[in-house]
Amino acid sequence: MKSRIVILVFGFIAIFMSCTAKNGGGSFWLSDDLDTTTYYYSKINDTTYYLKFEKLCDTKAEGYFFVFSDDVYVNKENFVIESKGKNHIVKYRNNTVKTRIQCFVRENGLVVQYATFGKVLGIFNKLTWSEEINFKKYRKPTFVKYPARYKEKVFDKIEVKHDVVYGSAEGYWDSYPTETETYIEILTKGVLSTVSKKNLDLKMDIYYPVGDSLEKRPFIMFIHGGGFYIGDKKSEAMVEYCKYFAHMGYVTASVNYRLGFKPMGPSVERAGYRALQDIHAAMRFIVKNASVYGIDTDYLFAGGSSAGGVTSLNLAFMRNKNRPESTTKGLLYDDLGNIESSTNSIKAEFSLKAVINMWGAVNDLEILKNSQTSVISFHGDADKIVPIDYDYPFQDMKSQINTLILFKMYGSLPIHIKLKELGRREELHIFENAGHSLNVDEDNHLNENFKFICYKSRDFLYGEIFPESYKIKSIPMTLFHRAMPLYETNCKDYVKMFWDIEGGVIVGMKDNQVRVVWFENAHKHKLKLSILTDTGAGFYDEYEF
């Protein structure tokens, strides 16, 4: 009985080369309808067989078969079918069987019959034909790999809307480009400029890809550094960060904010708070005008260097309850108001998905409890401007003036220790023996660290758009036995999803799950996943063992 079942399975292959046995045709040929690139399968006596042939000639067919089961691995077993006149010789598993077969090729499969030989009156040959057996044609799943938007360059051209006004406020200045002056020289020159304030129109430059049909894109706001005293949205680093991410499909912006402070008391801290108020207003402006600029407000990010890093962190984590005492009304100072009360009157709520912190710091680690925002940081362990640990900024000032006008701050190291304790998604990159402004060289030109920061930030933000759960995982999950019959992705908000396999066969797909069988002796075992999400981005993952 077992031999008959196997004959049933293999016999149809030989018929691809023969005429109909019942009609007595003696010719053999290769059917043009035969698909040599895929499998044919049939369920016989509760067992499913998959067959595929690889070599064909006029009188001979060779291929392999496997039996589908609940086992993780299957063995491919070879077979050979030869035509002998009207009959066929099937060889498999060290068996040789003589039979006669007929087959009708259909678009979606095959209809097969086989015959057994007998004698009439012990003299004449008699053929007894089996019932028809239907073999379905295996349709290999289509596989399309989409461009990895947000991880690779997908747009050649970008455009910039310059000097978009997002608000106005009273301040000293909002732009102070400088390349050669030392910080002390700048502070000295700026003393006269802080005698009185004036109303400032605050602006941003918005970068976006050209030819993008997507209506809602993630947004990154970049904030320049300069100790809340100098800097400009057109600084080379901020411009290049904006361009880099815009080429990958983001909308980005480089923002100017109020700068300047009097070199006394808590003025520096108040300047940092004014910067936060302005940047908060800039983000409210973006949220209100999201449809104008094609921005997805579910994916808002901020990044900055030095003072810009400080402001990015405060934007994500500081709340009005955490306002520095110096920002409230005192004998010498007016109340600066709540975070969202300045610069423009837009009412809009938002939360940041992640922050790119480049050598920034915070005044209080407790503010990190206020948000689930993820953080990636870059910091030199020899930074004397914004120390990586808990210390006073500007340690290169003479006579320890910094201890008189500044407060100690928590650098990237304690920030990430705290984030790890809180279970936040975080990533810290420490540069050994490196000081401040890691992304430029001695001549103030962008260096290799700039590229490193771009690549690592790209991957980190990509992980926010495509969380770890999107990756292929086995069912059940296991760390040691990666070969499983079932796999899935937790991505539910997809437009299209495709699976592919090497070293096995996909035998079933449902929603976000796939069922496979692996060939035990395959040179490579790899499962591939490609997704087009509702964000318009392509996601790709491989599961290999």
Each model region followed by its residue ranges:
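N-terminal cap/lid segment of alpha/beta-hydrolase-fold proteins
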Residues: 138-215
